[in-house]
């Protein structure tokens, strides 16, 4: 923060402790304390857990432990993933039936889909109840918790919505393949 001469640091909640340390140290270094903005962390689509304790707040600690990480390829979504890659990652995602809390697919619906679209469309065969639209996360959570929505239907619906959400980025990379290659060089996995 100080080396880059930043007035404001933006990051995930996992950087909160170091940012608070920077705010405490700034006056001692004769610098203004930076403004720090922290975003919630998207959970990994796979069951992963980092070792250690990261925050005194148990909810923040849990979100850091289960965060999406570029080092776990199948658990992380990349902005340059193809629609097929996104669909496959969601298809393989941890998504326990009737479990709302601690379910990464439900978390993605809550954090990605509803803020942008204010609804989640589920396309399914009439054999399985036909198409359905959930107009709020609360409505989705209630239905999923009761078992009215199958995990595969949830995965397919969230996958379609996330694919639509990043379509402008997909279009950009399709028109600028050299930038797509540069982005892929930055992707480091285990």
What are the residue ranges of the model-derived segments?
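Conserved alpha/beta enzyme-core scaffolds, especially Rossmann-like or related mixed alpha/beta domains
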Residues: 1-15
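Conserved nucleotide- and phosphate/pyrophosphate-binding catalytic cores
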Residues: 16-190
């Amino acid at each position: 923060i100080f080396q880059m001469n930043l007035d404001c640091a933006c990051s995930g909640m996992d950087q909160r402790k170091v940012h608070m340390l920077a705010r405490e140290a700034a006056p001692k270094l004769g610098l203004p304390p930076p403004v720090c903005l922290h975003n919630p962390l998207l959970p990994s689509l796979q069951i992963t857990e980092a070792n250690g304790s990261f925050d005194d707040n148990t909810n923040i600690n849990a979100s850091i432990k289960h965060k999406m990480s570029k080092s776990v390829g199948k658990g992380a979504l990349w902005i340059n993933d193809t629609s097929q890659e996104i669909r496959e990652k969601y298809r393989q995602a941890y998504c326990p039936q009737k479990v709302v809390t601690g379910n990464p697919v439900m978390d993605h619906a809550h954090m990605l889909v509803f803020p942008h679209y204010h609804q989640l469309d589920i396309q399914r065969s009439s054999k399985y109840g036909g198409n359905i639209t959930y107009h709020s996360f609360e409505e989705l959570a209630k239905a999923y918790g009761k078992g009215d929505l199958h995990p595969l239907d949830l995965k397919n619906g969230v996958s379609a919505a996330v694919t639509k959400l990043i379509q402008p980025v997909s279009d950009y990379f399709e028109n600028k393949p050299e930038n797509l290659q540069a982005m892929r060089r930055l992707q480091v996995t285990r």
